Amino acid sequence: MQTRHRAKKSLGQNFLQDANIARKIVDSLKITENDSIIEIGPGQGALTKFILEAGPESLTLVEKDRDLAPALEAEYPEARVELEDALKFDWAGLDPDRNWKIVGNLPYNVASKIMWDIAAQCNATCVFMVQHEVAQRVTSGPGSKKYGAISVWIQSFCRTDYLFKVPPTVFKPKPKVDSAVIKFFPLPEEEKPSDIEGLAKLVKYCFQYRRKQLGKILKSFISDAVIQWAEKEGVSLTDRPEALSPLQFQSLYKSVKNDFPS
């Protein structure tokens, strides 16, 4: 798509210029004719043309920039363009009977929030390009210094894979940091947590004090149930939050939910 549109810093726009990387990102999604695709922030259409070439059942482009939407509609009439902020998109309202896949070069300033919402609200395979540091955090496991609230949260709903690193030189304007492409595979519904609001609060609360021991973080909520939880899980209350797996956070919440502030 040819356009003189200047990237808007307020929207975190960095347009991908490398067709080989664009194709590699789309190939990572493994699109079939039965897939309904949502692309977040299509911008100048770097990924869009390769998505359409893959032949999905449908393609929806979620674009916040009203200056770009008309050009996208003209260039890709096969796609439906929705002028909307991905942070306000109704991810939970997607038809559960359709095979959804979501892809996008996410703006650095809102990428974590978008992924947080999508992981919990819809059952979709996703491929996202994000800031390299964020990609490391999302895909890190327990015990890693990169492991944090977003790692626990997204991995409570999805299996995550780090795919490949992307240099700043392939964007216009060039960002100051590296990017990376990651992939989410949704877990079976029966393996996902149920009380997601409570779990989210607990995870965020614990990682606010990530250098403290669990016993000190949870001192107001220590009960026989928590002590039994620690014994059952083989966890010491002298451990720090980064030692707990997503499943252990879920079982911890069940032990403290009656005392934890709603």
UniProtKB/Swiss-Prot annotation:
Signal peptide: none
UniProt subcellular location: Cytoplasm
Chief location bin: cytoplasm
Alphabetized Gene3D superfamilies for the sequence: Ribosomal RNA adenine dimethylase-like, domain 2, Vaccinia Virus protein VP39
E.C. code: 2.1.1.182
Domain of life: Bacteria
Annotated coiled-coil segments of the chain: none
Protein name, per record: Ribosomal RNA small subunit methyltransferase A
Record organism: Maridesulfovibrio salexigens (strain ATCC 14822 / DSM 2638 / NCIMB 8403 / VKM B-1763) (Desulfovibrio salexigens)
Gene: rsmA
